[in-house]
Regions:
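Residues that scaffold, gate, or flank divalent-cation-dependent active/transport sites
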Residues: 1-105
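DNA-contacting surface of Y-family translesion DNA polymerases
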Residues: 6, 183, 191-333, 342-343
């Protein structure tokens, strides 16, 4: 019997800031660009539950967040702090797992099938993990327990913040029945709209659609969705694929055609990404540059190296080389992004 835990740190960036600044507790707070000094540029990187009451969410333009809640506390992104905290926390989680998979800076999967012979034992372990996290880091997390990664992740999302939800194999069908199709992994606004257009709103309704019909509508993903709707997920918890990529993007205060400014900002974000890479002790093989122009046209370019690299100099040089073609365009640049991937 497989028993998988999905651990999700609650509103991570803001919660870390609250530990350092206890006066933020109970106040709406956002991590992102300064809405006034930055003239409303940039987006919300993270927000606490108090700010969500005003309709603020991650990815929202900072200008809209400010309009929704002018009294919100807006904090700058402190990625070094978040990475350092994440590294410590993941070491706590890792020691409680038979197998451990990092899903991102604020989430992970734990396969506890060997050390936990029942769901009761798994719940006791989850309580222990939550207690250790609170005592050592003064942070909370939400944990989902299930027979696979899919169910564990959905379960973790059902009780936030500081929740604990366990779904046994025999409870999976009933648990999924009334949930929105959006709760399934990989279902975004576009897929949801396609399903809604044929009156499919819940996972229960989705199970009534044939595999062939889903494949016709959604291609290969249709086959995956057919299985997900039935709670089927055979993917293992994999130690080797902890983080698939590390990246950062920045929106300029004003759309710019200043080549020097773009290159300076690129150098800055490459350094930030490299710090994260170094914290996790990774090597990289692929460098990707992303550019968004003033008309919102977005494009990217990548280069893969023959062997893994660990130095910043190569990353900086390749980033400059890749962005050169984009700088020849007459349009002003709104946003640039940099990502390191194929990590090992």
């Amino acid at each position: 019997m497989r028993i998988i835990l999905h651990v999700d740190l609650d509103y991570f960036y803001v919660q870390v800031e609250e530990v350092l600044k206890p006066e933020l507790k109970g106040k709406p707070a956002v991590v992102g660009a300064d809405p006034q000094k930055g003239h409303g540029r940039g987006v919300v990187s993270a927000c606490n539950y108090e700010s969500r009451k005003y309709g603020i969410h991650s990815g929202m333009p900072i200008s809209i967040a400010f309009r929704k809640c002018p009294d919100c506390v807006f904090l700058p992104v402190n990625m070094d702090l978040y990475v350092e905290t994440s590294v410590r926390i993941m070491q706590i989680f890792r020691k409680h797992a038979d197998k451990f998979e990092l899903g991102g800076i604020d989430e992970c999967y734990l396969d506890v099938s060997k050390r936990c012979k029942s769901y009761k034992q798994a719940e006791e372990l989850a309580v222990k993990i939550k207690s250790e996290l609170k005592n050592k880091e003064k942070l909370t997390c939400s944990i989902g327990i299930g027979p696979n990664k899919l169910i564990a992740k959905i379960a973790a999302n059902k009780q936030k913040p500081n929740g604990l939800t366990a779904i046994k194999p025999e409870q999976v069908k009933e648990f999924l029945q009334k949930l929105s199709v959006r709760d399934l992994m990989g279902v975004g606004p576009k897929t949801e709209a396609v399903l809604n257009s044929i009156n499919i709103f819940t996972i229960g309704q989705l199970t009534k659609v044939s595999e062939a019909s889903l494949a016709e509508m959604l291609g290969k993903f249709g086959y995956t969705l057919y299985l997900e709707a039935r709670g089927v997920d055979e993917s293992p918890v994999e130690e080797s694929e902890e983080i698939k990529s590390i990246g950062r993007q920045v929106t300029f205060e004003k759309d710019t055609g200043d080549k020097k400014l773009v290159l300076e900002k690129l150098q800055e974000i490459v350094s930030d990404v490299y710090k994260t890479l170094r914290e996790y002790k990774f090597a990289y093989k692929t460098i990707t540059i992303k550019v968004r122009y003033e008309d919102f046209y977005t494009t990217s370019k990548a280069e893969s190296l023959k062997t893994p690299h660990t130095d910043e100099e190569t990353a900086q040089q390749k980033a400059r080389d890749l962005i050169e073609a984009f700088l020849l365009d007459e349009r002003k640049i709104r946003l640039i992004g940099f990502t390191l991937s194929k990590l090992s």
